[in-house]
Amino acid sequence: MMARVTFAHALRSEAARLRRSPLVWRHAVLATVLGGLAGAYFAFSAWDSLMGTDAFFQLLGAGAPLLAGISCGLAADAEQRAGEAANLLGVSSRRSALAAKIVALLGLGLAAAAWAAVLFCAALALAGRPMPELPALALAVLGIALGSACSYAIFLIVALKWGRNASIGLGALGFIAAMALLGGLANGLVTGTFSGALGAEAAALVPFAWPSRLATLPLEASIASAMGAAGQARALASAWTTVALACVVATAVVAAAVLACANRFEGRRGGE
């Protein structure tokens, strides 16, 4: 009788395999380049560094669906080449294996976002530029991860069923949608407005928009509070709550659906 694979065992296995995966250094290089260059730019440019930080986190959040699509696509491709995804679909507990893969990839994305944020903020600090409060920055990083969880669950299934390109294409669509809902790249920085609140009710219904909104709204609320705009800060905090609740509920539903259907899921066959 085949031994049952627990989630903890599957997660340890994923962690060990990730240490040898090119996904780790790709995430590290991307985060280093993005955080370092953006930090150096806003440390010495004439732009307001508070709004520059907001714009940077908007970019991080908007890019999260694309990163998720690429990560899930490459991970599924590697599983397919290693043995037609037997490590995920051929084990005694697909639920544990799939959940561990999703959590491992999400953790890698969180680590990349955190490292990029650290480099960006370090550059501003060394230049003596003002930044939002540390709790708001931490909440922004965690918001990117929370907002991305649903995308990772969906994209991994898409990649296993229809291949790497389908997952990456869906991630690219998510990046475009997230930026469009914010009014474009650096819209708030250019206009001097809190663009995180732009169409927040509609953004709460779009999973691709969650990482960027959950990243930018706590920062904008912190900035507004520091400016003495208490009413605006409360409105931004309320918008964050709306998006966060929608994200948590929908993510729980998607996770439950993925786990419930895991044992009936069929991936690609060797020739497909």
Describe every region a protein language model picked out.
Residues 1-61, 67, 228-272:
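Hydrophobic alpha-helical transmembrane segments
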Residues 25, 95, 165-166:
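Residues that define the loop-to-transmembrane-helix transition and helix capping
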Residues 28, 98, 168-169:
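Hydrophobic/aromatic positions within or immediately flanking transmembrane alpha-helices
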Residues 30-34, 104, 171-178:
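Transmembrane alpha-helical core residues of multi-pass small-molecule transporters
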Residues 33-68, 72, 102-166, 232-241:
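Secretory targeting signals
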Residues 47, 168, 174-272:
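Terminal transmembrane helical anchor/hairpin motif
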